[in-house]
């Protein structure tokens, strides 16, 4: 189990069998959203200072990549089928990163959204076969709060 400790600039790693706790120090700050690729031993972590999408090897605890990302990231999801990472941030964008191999990632898309829209949900393929990405857009003086729905495509 992985737990963000943003005030300490660390990730706690809890062994569920032994209850031992290890800590991975970070060189980046304000680590908040995380997603796990358990099959390939990769942990994806969004940071605020600076805005990065960091990739960790869960077997060694080493950071293997850190790419510039959306500011004020709140949610981050891993799409195992497409080998993609989706990251929503209050800066007003959804960043999509593509994994080319276990050590290499690149920015695939930077989709404009709405300033302050940073809370998101991605649940993979739904009952009707569509894959949806949901984004909560906060209320403004000229309109109420909304949920924007995106269809994930190859």
How would you label these PLM feature ranges?
Residues 1-154:
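Predominantly soluble domains enriched in secretory-pathway, periplasmic, or organellar proteins
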């Amino acid at each position: 189990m992985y737990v963000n400790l943003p005030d300490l600039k660390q990730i706690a790693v809890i062994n569920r069998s032994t209850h031992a706790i290890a800590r991975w120090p970070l060189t980046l700050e304000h680590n908040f959203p995380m997603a796990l690729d358990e099959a390939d031993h990769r942990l994806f972590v969004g940071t605020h200072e600076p805005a990065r999408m960091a990739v960790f090897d869960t077997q060694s605890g080493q950071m293997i990549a850190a790419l510039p990302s959306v500011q004020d990231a709140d949610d981050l999801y891993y799409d195992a089928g497409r080998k993609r990472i989706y990251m929503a941030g209050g800066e007003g964008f959804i960043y999509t990163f593509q994994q080319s191999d276990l050590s290499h990632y690149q920015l695939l898309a930077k989709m404009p959204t709405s300033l302050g829209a940073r809370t998101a949900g991605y649940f993979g393929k739904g009952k009707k076969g569509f894959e949806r990405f949901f984004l909560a857009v906060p209320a403004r003086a000229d309109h109420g709060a909304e949920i924007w729905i995106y269809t994930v495509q190859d």
